[in-house]
Amino acid sequence: MIVTFLGTGSGAPTTRRNVSGIGLRFLQAGKWWLFDCGEGTQHQLLRAPMKISQLDKIFITHLHGDHLYGLIGLLASRSLRNTEPTPLELYGPPGLDRYFRGIMEASPVHLQYPLEIKIVSEGVIYEDEEIVVSCRMAKHRVPSFAYAVMEKEKTGAFQVERAKQAGVPSGPLFGALKRGEQVTLEDGRVLDGKDFVGEPQPGRKIVFSGDTEPSQAVLELAKGADLLVHEATYAHHDKELATRSGHSTAREAAQIAKEAGVKELCLTHFSPRYEDEDGDFSMEDLLAEAQQIFPATQLADDLGSISVKRERSDGRKP
């Protein structure tokens, strides 16, 4: 799983940072998901390692323009770039469906693929054989949701040599053991497939906070995550601005990461006021503020990526 940042700024784009958009790639599945779609997201995709034709799902955290205004253009471009009409699912807060219908009534776009809009509420909003997506209400000026993407535990590898040494013949019995079933050999021995499977591999967990003040709900959602992507619009000396606008400081995001017990924290959604390297407070200072509380912190950059690898049961990367 690879997280790629398409926009890491807040409010409006700058020469260095576009507004919010984050891609999550599933390499083996050949698909990817998008979290928020600020204006200019499809332009960023032209320089990113994702194809719009392989976009499978979009998750909108809330209906502020810097997280939403690129959506209609991207949906239209997906029609032009898709040779096959693969379906697309769009998840988001109440009002997203009305927003979409209003745009379509004023400026109709004929989509060449099925689009399903799903209005979310707290809890599990998507599940398949490998992935569960859940959300919690964050703390912002408008309804805003944080999303958690969790892989299910992966069955351990089948121990082929051990099965052969136990005298299991190739064929149906071998296959039954691989499925974890019990089998009876010709000599009467009963073998349990569970004894021939290695330790299960824990699934990965990635959490996207969206826009939020420090939130107990987001903290609970993030518990044990491999990666927490949390907004840090302001430095802590601008705490009053953060509170007034419904945002977090870098220090507050780091405290959330620490209390949630996450492995890594990546900060995003930065105010442009810290971009001036000659100013009183720089992005490096913002990072240092967070690292004082949670050392495993990094800053997101446009078109930068973070690879989240699956850990083995012994805690090591495979």
UniProtKB/Swiss-Prot annotation:
<dbReference type="GO" id="GO:0042781">
    <property type="term" value="F:3'-tRNA processing endoribonuclease activity"/>
</dbReference>
<protein>
    <recommendedName>
        <fullName>Ribonuclease Z</fullName>
        <ecNumber>3.1.26.11</ecNumber>
    </recommendedName>
</protein>
<feature type="binding site">
    <location>
        <position position="140"/>
    </location>
    <ligand>
        <name>Zn(2+) 1</name>
    </ligand>
</feature>
<feature type="binding site">
    <location>
        <position position="269"/>
    </location>
    <ligand>
        <name>Zn(2+) 2</name>
    </ligand>
</feature>
<dbReference type="InterPro" id="IPR001279">
    <property type="entry name" value="Metallo-B-lactamas"/>
</dbReference>
<keyword id="KW-0255">Endonuclease</keyword>
<comment type="similarity">
    <text>Belongs to the RNase Z family.</text>
</comment>
<feature type="binding site">
    <location>
        <position position="211"/>
    </location>
    <ligand>
        <name>Zn(2+) 2</name>
    </ligand>
</feature>
<keyword id="KW-0378">Hydrolase</keyword>
<dbReference type="InterPro" id="IPR013471">
    <property type="entry name" value="RNase_Z/BN"/>
</dbReference>
<feature type="binding site">
    <location>
        <position position="62"/>
    </location>
    <ligand>
        <name>Zn(2+) 1</name>
    </ligand>
</feature>
<feature type="binding site">
    <location>
        <position position="66"/>
    </location>
    <ligand>
        <name>Zn(2+) 2</name>
    </ligand>
</feature>
<feature type="active site" description="Proton acceptor">
    <location>
        <position position="66"/>
    </location>
</feature>
<dbReference type="Pfam" id="PF12706">
    <property type="entry name" value="Lactamase_B_2"/>
</dbReference>
<dbReference type="InterPro" id="IPR036866">
    <property type="entry name" value="RibonucZ/Hydroxyglut_hydro"/>
</dbReference>
<dbReference type="GO" id="GO:0008270">
    <property type="term" value="F:zinc ion binding"/>
</dbReference>
<keyword id="KW-0819">tRNA processing</keyword>
<comment type="function">
    <text>Zinc phosphodiesterase, which displays some tRNA 3'-processing endonuclease activity. Probably involved in tRNA maturation, by removing a 3'-trailer from precursor tRNA.</text>
</comment>
<feature type="binding site">
    <location>
        <position position="64"/>
    </location>
    <ligand>
        <name>Zn(2+) 1</name>
    </ligand>
</feature>
<keyword id="KW-0479">Metal-binding</keyword>
<comment type="subunit">
    <text>Homodimer.</text>
</comment>
<feature type="binding site">
    <location>
        <position position="67"/>
    </location>
    <ligand>
        <name>Zn(2+) 2</name>
    </ligand>
</feature>
<keyword id="KW-0862">Zinc</keyword>
<feature type="binding site">
    <location>
        <position position="211"/>
    </location>
    <ligand>
        <name>Zn(2+) 1</name>
    </ligand>
</feature>
<keyword id="KW-0540">Nuclease</keyword>
